[in-house]
UniProtKB/Swiss-Prot annotation:
UniProt family annotation: Belongs to the GEM family.
Pfam family, one: GRAM
PANTHER family referenced in this protein's UniProt entry, alphabetically: GEM-LIKE PROTEIN 2 (PTHR31969)
GO CC terms of this entry: plastid
Matching SMART domains: GRAM (SM00568)
Region listing for Disordered, in residue ranges: 1-42
Protein name: GEM-like protein 5
InterPro entries the UniProt entry points to: GEM-like, GRAM, PH-like_dom_sf
GO terms classed as biological process: embryo development ending in seed dormancy; maintenance of seed dormancy by absisic acid; regulation of seed germination; seed germination
Residue ranges, compositional bias (Basic and acidic residues): 16-27
Annotated ranges, domain GRAM: 143-221
Domain of life: Eukaryota
């Protein structure tokens, strides 16, 4: 069955003028600190299997909390935003929420202060960095989903999962949004990338896959110590996405498998 034009793979780049990066604001090299690595990469990369970057495999054992131009990637949406103006790792997170309320900014800063001054940034805390969005935004995840991705007719958000997306430049920290129509992902903070024009910009990393385009959802567990746990999502047109670092891997796997199966069953019933 031929999908609608909206279901077809595409990249969308905002038409607003990207902000130029000054020399003093160039991204600093990633720290070797395990805790700081859990913020994920700050550089945009193409979706890729975990073996594409060693940090991806490390992230598979965590719990979530190439400045070169990438190849054409369907399902990936680029939205240039103003680059961070300080070295505070929280600033990009604040930037995501500042248009919604001043209160959200205060909550976010307090969150970072508590993490930074604590004895350690525990794995549980890293998972809560994403999930705290529900407390920061008055409308909860449903409102957040609508603001980031818009919604289709009769679309409702079912579940959200803090996790990482595997890319060629390392794991991207963010949240998976599962609705009755789509699987979507948005990074916690903007990432650095080079636009086709050669201009350096920052963009939130967003992936949107209609459930009609999902071919399979594959749980993958590598028996190591600790075990590496992934969820591989493949599309009908040959693309795949690897997610890892879930707070509750079994729950995320169950809901993704069930949602895709239910959609395919309903779709088959309608078309039949």
């Amino acid at each position: 069955m031929t999908g609608s034009q909206e279901d077809q793979p595409k990249i969308i780049i905002d038409q607003e003028q990207p902000k130029t990066l000054e020399t003093e604001h160039q991204p600093e090299p990633s720290s070797s600190s395990p805790d700081q690595k859990k913020w994920g990469t700050h550089v945009m990369g193409a979706p890729a299997a975990p073996v594409a970057h060693p940090d991806n495999q490390q992230a598979a054992a965590w719990v979530a909390g190439d400045n070169q131009q990438t190849q054409y990637q369907p399902y990936v949406i680029y939205s240039p935003v103003e680059h961070p103006t300080t070295n505070n790792p929280l600033e990009p997170v604040i930037g995501m929420f500042h248009t919604w309320s001043r209160k959200a900014e205060t909550v976010a800063r307090n969150l970072w202060h508590n993490l930074k001054t604590g004895p350690s940034m525990s794995e549980t805390a890293w998972g809560k960095v994403n999930l705290t969005a529900k407390a920061i935004t008055k409308g909860g995840f449903e409102s957040l989903f609508r603001q980031i991705f818009g919604t289709e007719p009769n679309e409702t958000l079912k579940k959200t999962f803090a996790c990482y997306l595997s890319t060629t430049t390392g794991p991207v920290a963010g949240t998976v949004y599962l609705s009755n129509a789509r699987v979507a992902f948005c990074s916690d903070r903007p990432l650095y990338f080079t636009a086709p024009s050669g201009q350096e910009s920052w963009s939130y990393y967003r992936v949107v896959v209609p459930l009609a385009n999902v071919a399979t959802v594959n749980p993958v567990v590598v028996k190591e110590t600790p075990p590496e746990k992934y969820i591989q999502l493949t599309t009908v047109d040959g693309h795949d996405f690897w997610f890892m670092g879930f707070v509750n891997y079994e729950k995320a796997t169950h809901h993704l498998l069930t949602s895709v199966s239910d959609f395919q069953t309903a779709h088959g019933s309608v078309s039949g």
